Amino acid sequence: MYPIIMEWNGGGSFNGRPLSWSKLERILSGKKVESLRPVLHEPDAQAPSSAMQGEASVPFAELHATSSYNFLTGASDPSDVVVQAKKLGLVALSVMDRDGFYGAVRFAEAAAEAGMHTVYGAELSLQEGVLTVLCKNPEGYKKLSHLISDAKMATGEKGEVRYPPLPMVAEHAAGDWVVLAGFQWLDKIDYVIDCFKPENIVLEFGSTMTPEDADRNEYLRRTQAKFQLRGILSTNPESAARGSVRLAGAKQALARKMPLADAESELHPMGTTWMRSGDTLLKAHPDYADLIATTVELAAECAFTLDLVAPNLPKWDTPGEHTEMSWLAHLVSTRIDTRYVGRSADIKARAATQIDYELGVIEKLGFPGYFLVVNDLVEFCRDSNILCQGRGSAANSAVCFVLGITNAEPISAGLLFERFLSPDRDGPPDIDIDIESGRREEVIQYVYEKYGRDNAAQVANVITYRTKGAMRDAARALGYPQGAADAWAKGTSEPPDDVLELAAQFKGQPRHLGIHSGGMVICDRPIADVVPVEWARMDNRSVVQWDKDDCATAGLVKFDLLGLGMLEAIHHMLDLVAEHRGKKINLWELDLAEPEVYDMLCKADAVGVFQVESRAQLSTLPRLKPRTFFDLVVEVALIRPGPIQGGSVHPYLRRRAGEEAITYDHPVLEKSLGKTLGIPLFQEQLMQVAVDAAGFSGGEADSLRRAMGSKRSPERMAALRSRFFQGLKDTNGIVGETAEKLWNKIVAFAAYGFPESHSQSFASLVYFSAWFKYHYPAEFCVGLLRAQPMGFYSPQSLISDARRHGVSILPITVNDSGVEADAPNGAIRLGLNLVKGLGHDAAQRIEDNAPFDSIPDLSRRADLNVAQVEALARAGAVDCLGVGRRQALWQAGVAATEKPGMLPGLSVIEAPALPGMSAFELMATNISATGVTADYQPMALIRERMEELGIVPADRLLEVEDGTRLRIAGIVTHRQRPQTASGLTFLGMEDETGLMNVMVSVGLWQRQRVLARNAKALIIRGIVQNAQGVATVVADRLEPLDMGEFLSRGSRDFR
């Protein structure tokens, strides 16, 4: 058999020359080319060179591949598809999604790295059928993006799509698309031709390795001859290689909501097709050489790179003759005196110089509009009485501080502006704005209203499979019962091998499109010029089809509007103190050095305090003993994965306690590391070391920081190393072993340093929340309750902590409680929103119509149904009406027939004499109905029994000698297994006297996994570790606590 080589065919005559790769490159450049056709060659004919990796003797372009970003269809990441295509010697590739460009940027990046020519397109879910189109050029891409976006937004529902009829789709394309018409379109081919014209239609022949191929392709051949249409061959691969075909099949079965076994009649018999080379296809289909050749020809017509011109930010409407830059400078100049009032003359002078420098950098980089947009968002919050503050690297900027975007003053803190915005930066800055979570939606809707729905959208978040989800969906796809799938996902039983194998393939795969926590893009023209927009699950939210990284790659400018529960809680605290105490508190006028606040934190009395309430932080506070605001900055940064993994925590604490000498590898490091006792903690310190020791500019230092990020280029690192060593020598005469030591320390430190600017911003909230906890514990607790869900602790734990601080807890009653908790006279009145099954609207009607004199009166005037009256009865909320809970439940059914407009008293019924409830029954009912108890912490009811068992209460643990074996008991509040803990699990436990820390080894967890994972309350036997005001029990045995299931609704578990 003679080899088949693709050759030029000039006007239908054979010219005797094989197609060279340079010619092929010319084809793919987008120039008009002659057709390709296969011809036979003698064995001694010159074949194309095989020196190039993956080069094939038969050029072929796969123009209808898909990836895992075609959700619940494809099995391979776009990069894997590109790598496999390169390996097989393909000359061009199209990786497309259904109704979107979800994976387009990742495909473009991978193809650019591999040197693969790209063709862009999509599958469109038209009413007439699924239409596959390729874009001929960037204009075609833009049109396709707009069509998809319009179809997605037309429905008003996430996941839905509604395209116009085919003729209108064709009119929209205006000749800038190629339609790939497969077998499913043959009965409508006349209609398709009439709409799109023959020159824009290519028949798609299938090579799916199924018996249907031959018959279907025969029909396609007849149609091709009849209408003189071009045709191509495609394997339509949903998997890059054969190894992941079962995963693709499983995904498609899930999409059909049926197990693989039942879906087999609708799926490919092998799961799916996979990518193959031109050589393989020609061997399998020797009669389709012309179709293979046409793939290259069509790729030449349609190949282009995704170098889209991203929209700019909208031009700012500046007053008078001002430019954006002059208006920004004007705003800064009018606010600088106010923001720096009370600061020293030296700080003011340095700030003025720094601001001039920053404004110069902003002007040079062309970013004044960015700052004006952020300033406008902050001003909207301020005018709307919404608490907000910028955080992250923006806190390094004096301009941001003066504008009121951030509240950390960078000059006195010694923060480096270049960490935020370097003169060498090639993209816009990144300003995160924390907004009180309960009102963030107002800010988001303001953005939509101001800039228009077409020009503003939220950034997507691609939801990927994690361990539990992968296990569940693998089990579902394989047809196992839901109960078994849940048990395997929870780890309560071992899954079979087939589930484990498939779950491993699912893990990390994209599952569906979600929404970013707060990222929004704002443009001066429709976002759909670049990427389609669709509805999000949340009401009135629209989202682009790309995540934050894809948006950044494409040049879309993102603003992060992040919801922060503590800001909402603090706003409630401010309002409560103003309402009940008559005091208006200005957070920025608080004394940040109040000793009593720091005394409280030193005792680890920080339940509910922002950022320092976790188990690890509570263990660190007594050892760090914070006395200044900067100590809080360190505390925020210290207990992070980076410093923990980098080994900074214990050396710093030892030096802090005077147990270890403060030393430096070279005296020049004292300036940058002195404030953290010679232990590097912050990313800015890495930059400052480079400036002080090696003479780097601020911009160079930021380049060093970024180069040492997660994707380290060996070439770039080598160049920076050379520059660093030369700088050490020239600036400070540092050479040899000391230079090597400094470089190695910087390289290691870069992987774990935490931004000081971030810590500075958060430390303010640490202090504010601690200040409220010390001065106004009732308002503090109620603020946290009103902002739920948030933080580390459940409402029950927060209420118990307030009780331990002497605050009276008043129960829920229909006559005294509002919808939310309140803080009258320094006490806490629990709110109706805690009553399970009541609902917000019913709670609001109760608040609006109170007081009531009977259950029928309550039911009639608050318009309650039976279930709502029963919920109130179980919660004890009608005890104030002089009716016991059992009597109230008896009356509920009849009383609920009382409705507004009816004559009162018609439903009165006398309940029989019923026994009252015991204290334990009342407690258990309260926990079940509301999740909290007002009178006491549940463990108090069984304290006598605990003492008989020799159980040590939480408040006596610090009195126990280190190394003593003991038993403790309590409600499990948390389970946490940090990645930095080598598999150890930490339990948070609580009794009526306080909190306890328990450490469970890997072996003990495995031996008693069901109990450890599921018990609501436990007895723990173990060894107490007692040092520096911190007690931890290292468990060696877990026991169930009798009736423990009644003591709590469950724990809050974290990683």
Swiss-Prot record:
Keywords: Cytoplasm, DNA damage, DNA repair, DNA replication, DNA-directed DNA polymerase, Nucleotidyltransferase, Transferase. GO terms for biological process: DNA repair; DNA replication; SOS response. The keyword DNA damage applies. It comes from Corynebacterium glutamicum (strain ATCC 13032 / DSM 20300 / JCM 1318 / BCRC 11384 / CCUG 27702 / LMG 3730 / NBRC 12168 / NCIMB 10025 / NRRL B-2784 / 534). CDD domains: DnaE_OBF (cd04485), PHP_PolIIIA (cd07431). It catalyses: DNA(n) + a 2'-deoxyribonucleoside 5'-triphosphate = DNA(n+1) + diphosphate. This is Error-prone DNA polymerase. It is found in: Cytoplasm. The keyword rRNA processing does not apply. NCBIfam families: PRK05672.1. GO terms for molecular function: 3'-5' exonuclease activity; DNA-directed DNA polymerase activity; nucleic acid binding. InterPro entries: DNA_pol3_alpha_NTPase_dom, DNA_pol3_finger, DnaE2, DnaE2/DnaE/PolC, DNAPol_HHH, NA-bd_OB_tRNA, PHP_dom, Pol/His_phosphatase_N. The gene is dnaE2. Its EC number is 2.7.7.7. DNA polymerase involved in damage-induced mutagenesis and translesion synthesis (TLS). It is not the major replicative DNA polymerase. Its main location: cytoplasm. GO terms for cellular component: cytoplasm. It is an enzyme of class 2 (transferase). Belongs to the DNA polymerase type-C family. DnaE2 subfamily.
